[in-house]
Amino acid sequence: MNHTSQAFITAASGGQPPNYERIKEEYEVAEMGAPHGSASVRTTVINMPREVSVPDHVVWSLFNTLFMNFCCLGFIAYAYSVKSRDRKMVGDVTGAQAYASTAKCLNISTLVLSILMVVITIVSVIIIVLNAQNLHT
């Protein structure tokens, strides 16, 4: 397709996508060998496995890696989250759930330990400042 035909096609359609309509059609199909008056009803059941949503906690792990990386637990949680996402893309739901569970535990421990360290640091600074003020008075 050369450039002039492409320009002609886009100019003819006005640059907008074509308008599609849904057409519903029904057909009757008679079974071979069966009389028309006594048609048997057959039921077909199709079991469709429902898509299991496995949370991989990648965003939480990335946040912990960037902002609360206590003893590199956030980075390890991020690695497990990526493994969980890879397993989910392959279709291994059990493996994805196992990696996601490990990532969740690591994220919780990272969050708790990091908050605990922030609180200990703030309390330590307050105690040091108060002791320094008492020594100067």
UniProtKB/Swiss-Prot annotation:
Cross-link (Glycyl lysine isopeptide (Lys-Gly) (interchain with G-Cter in ubiquitin)): 24, 83, 88, 104
Residue spans that sit within the membrane without traversing it, per the record: 58-78
Lipid-acceptor residues (S-palmitoyl cysteine): 71-72, 105
Expression across tissues: Expressed in acinar cell. Predominantly expressed in nascent primordial germ cells, as well as in gonadal germ cells.
Interaction with VAPA: annotated span: 108-133
Membrane topology type: Single-pass type II membrane protein
Posttranslational modification: Polyubiquitinated with both 'Lys-48' and 'Lys-63' linkages. Ubiquitination negatively regulates antiviral activity. Lys-24 is the most prevalent ubiquitination site. Phosphorylation at Tyr-20 is required for endosomal and lysosomal location.
Cytoplasmic side: 1-57, 79-109
Cell compartment(s), UniProt: Cell membrane; Late endosome membrane; Early endosome membrane; Lysosome membrane
Induction details: By alpha interferon. Induced in pancreas during caerulein-induced pancreatitis. Induced in pancreas under systemic-lipopolysaccharide treatment and in intestine under Salmonella infection.
Principal subcellular localization: membrane
Keyword tags: Antiviral defense, Cell membrane, Cytoplasm, Endosome, Immunity, Innate immunity, Isopeptide bond, Lipoprotein, Lysosome, Membrane, Palmitate, Phosphoprotein, Signal-anchor, Transmembrane, Transmembrane helix, Ubl conjugation
Region Interaction with SPP1, annotated ranges: 60-93
Pfam families recorded: CD225 (PF04505)
GO cellular component, one term: early endosome membrane
GO BP annotation list: defense response to virus; host-mediated suppression of symbiont invasion; negative regulation of cell population proliferation; receptor-mediated endocytosis; response to virus; type I interferon-mediated signaling pathway
Membrane listed as a keyword: yes
Sites bearing Phosphotyrosine, chain numbering: 20, 27
TM annotation in the entry: 110-130
Extracellular topological segments: 131-137
Function: IFN-induced antiviral protein which disrupts intracellular cholesterol homeostasis. Inhibits the entry of viruses to the host cell cytoplasm by preventing viral fusion with cholesterol depleted endosomes. May inactivate new enveloped viruses which buds out of the infected cell, by letting them go out with a cholesterol depleted membrane.
Family: Belongs to the CD225/Dispanin family.
Subunit structure: Interacts with ATP6V0B. Interacts with CD81. Interacts with SPP1; the interaction reduces OPN expression. Interacts with BRI3.
Name of protein: Interferon-induced transmembrane protein 3
Encoding gene (name): Ifitm3
